């Protein structure tokens, strides 16, 4: 695999910024967004102006984990109205959502998880967006066939409501592409897709390039791009082959940066990571 060095990146950044016709431009546009939690503004509408000022093309918002009157923090008409107003004002889309409450009540076995997913489907529709990320991590990570089957069965019922709302349920986890497809098939719904995280897959020992090409655009709803705790391009993940694979499957939509800020200078680090990935896209 070809690796982009930082020297090469810095030397070509200006040219990439001026480039108006990359290979990605020949297909429907891949847009680069950012997660609100990596802006340290989880479940906070102020993530939208910050992301816009940093140059991102969308924001993936989380609904929050610390309940307010028994509901997720974003489950409030005034909060939803604020999100929509800021999205219009700063001309930046809400590109997707995340039911991060599943970190507390996981869908692999906790009956309470269904409530948070159903509420999040409703909120996702209210925010006029389509992709709802369902995380399976920590003690809620999928590890056994029984757990995967339980998740698939739970998704079968939840997907009915997602389909009615025009919402896609995106599975983000640490299992293989093949196991994710088995869950999708068990759900019996085209509204259940893979939310592909290149960092999680690499750490779990899978080959992102191979998996992205095998899954194809029809089974992936969005991407997370990261190589934490490093800057993009300075860790072990080689992004040029990954971005070429995304291009080659003709994926269009959003890839959200879920990248850390290694220097703790949040805005500078976010700009640096965004510039890097756009440079890679220009070379793809």
Identify the role of each PLM range.
Residues 2-19, 24-31, 40-54, 177-284:
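Histidine-acidic metal/acid-base catalytic patches
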Residues 14-18, 46-48, 52, 86-96, ...:
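Active-site acidic/histidine proton-transfer and metal-coordination neighborhood
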Residues 30-35, 59-61, 94-99, 132-134, ...:
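Hydrophobic faces of well-ordered beta-strands that scaffold small-molecule active sites
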Residues 34-35, 68-71, 104-108, 144-146, ...:
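Short, contiguous strand/loop micro-motifs
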Residues 38, 63-65, 100-103, 136-140, ...:
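Active-site-proximal loop/turn and secondary-structure-junction residues that shape catalytic pockets
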Residues 62-82, 138-143:
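Glycine-rich, proline-tolerant flexible connector loops at the mouths of alpha/beta enzymes
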Residues 67-74, 91-99, 130-135, 168-172, ...:
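Low-complexity, flexible helical/coil segments
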Residues 74-80, 110-118, 147-155, 207-213, ...:
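Charged helix-capping and loop-helix junction motifs
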């Amino acid at each position: 695999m070809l690796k982009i060095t930082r020297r090469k990146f810095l030397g070509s950044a200006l040219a990439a910024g001026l480039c108006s016709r990359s290979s990605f431009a020949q297909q429907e546009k891949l847009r680069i967004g950012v997660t609100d939690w990596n802006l340290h503004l989880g479940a906070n509408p102020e993530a939208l102006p910050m992301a816009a000022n940093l140059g991102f093309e969308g924001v993936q918002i989380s609904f929050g984990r610390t309940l307010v009157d028994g509901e997720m923090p974003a489950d409030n008409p005034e909060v939803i109205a604020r999100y929509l107003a800021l999205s219009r004002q700063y001309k930046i889309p809400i590109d997707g959502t995340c039911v991060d409450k599943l970190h507390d009540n996981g869908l692999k076995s906790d009956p309470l998880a269904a409530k948070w997913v159903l509420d999040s489907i409703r909120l996702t529709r209210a925010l006029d967006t389509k992709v709802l990320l369902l995380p399976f991590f920590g003690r809620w990570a999928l590890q056994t066939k029984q757990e995967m089957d339980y998740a698939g069965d739970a998704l079968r019922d939840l997907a009915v409501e997602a389909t009615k709302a025009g919402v896609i349920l995106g599975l983000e986890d640490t299992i293989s592409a093949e196991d994710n497809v088995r869950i999708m098939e068990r759900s019996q719904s085209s509204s259940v897709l893979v939310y592909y995280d290149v960092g999680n897959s690499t750490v779990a020992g899978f080959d992102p390039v191979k998996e992205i090409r095998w899954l194809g655009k029809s089974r992936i709803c969005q991407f997370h791009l990261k190589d934490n705790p490093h800057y993009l391009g300075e860790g072990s993940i080689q992004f040029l082959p990954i971005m070429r694979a995304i291009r080659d499957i003709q994926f269009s939509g959003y890839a959200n940066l879920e990248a850390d800020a290694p220097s703790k200078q949040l805005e500078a680090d976010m700009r640096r990571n965004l510039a890097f990935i756009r440079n890679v896209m220009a070379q793809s």
